[in-house]
Amino acid sequence: FWNYRNNKYQVNVIDTPGHVDFTVEVNRSLRVLDGLVFLFSAVDGVEPQSETNWRLADNYAVPRIGFVNKMDRSGADFLKVVGQVKSMLGSEAVALQLPIGAEDTFTGVVDLINNRGIIWNEHDKGMTFTEVPIPEDMLEEVAEYRERLLEAVAGYDESLMEKFFEDPNSLTEREILNALRAAVLDNSIVPMVCGSSFKNKGVQTMLDLVMELLPSPMDSEGVKGTHPDTGAELLRKPDVNEPFAALGFIRAYSGKLDAGSYVLNTRSGNKERISRIFQMHANKQNPIPFIEAGDIGAVVGFKDIKTGDTLCDPKHPVILESMEFADPVIQLAIEPKTKAGQEKMGIALS
């Protein structure tokens, strides 16, 4: 949960591995995500696997924010990475911040939207920050990159273009954020921010921008599927009053699923009873009575289910778009010799 402007938001986070061997895990996650925070190293910039994962995100048209991490490391260069995201990934990457210092002198950022400096406090390990004037030696650079930001936003929203040419500083924070959000949802602009997750610097401002710019499940017009018998196209809207539809792990796209209820697996044609539902937090399982449109949860009770299966209300069957995976380079199965070893193997693998 994250508190932002007196509102409490529930954020379902799926952390995907960055190594090439686990590209399939990224693909599985992108299929059910509404928005994405794409991590880059401030030292290494855009890497080959970054390009692969970016293309996967493009395939699913997932709106995204770029977070340039490791600003405290030797060789960190935020603007170099922003340039690489533009040139190598072909995106309209726009800096929303400029770092105050770099490497061992990285202390904060300049917020280009609000024209303010932010310094994270060392005494509480970055849990809080202090607003400060923009350093004098950065004023010229800040003015240049703020104008680039406002020009990009005004270029997307024609209603702001005239106002931008008359007086760029007349654009309000809300006007900038609203236009920027629309551009992000349209995948026309990729906002770029920076920080050091190890030192807890920049994470808070990044999460605030997630609330402002990335889509809520309720922003979706709905998910398209097909009727398993007739092949007719169906649209399921993110509404708890719609018939239930989900993909197993599970991501709910419409309706509401109660523990103890039955769902139809449209691949197998079997009905499955959902005995229990959990909200996952790392390796902790918190029992919950139901999930509804937009939620992600884990369920117990399946007898026959595969990744990409569609689960739905038996009275309103639908097949959602599944997932396509590349053939594995090598196949290997691990299984316990005895039932007693099953729990031990689970602990070892986790």
Language-model features, listed with the residues they occupy:
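Structural and coupling elements of P-loop NTPases
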Residues: 1-350
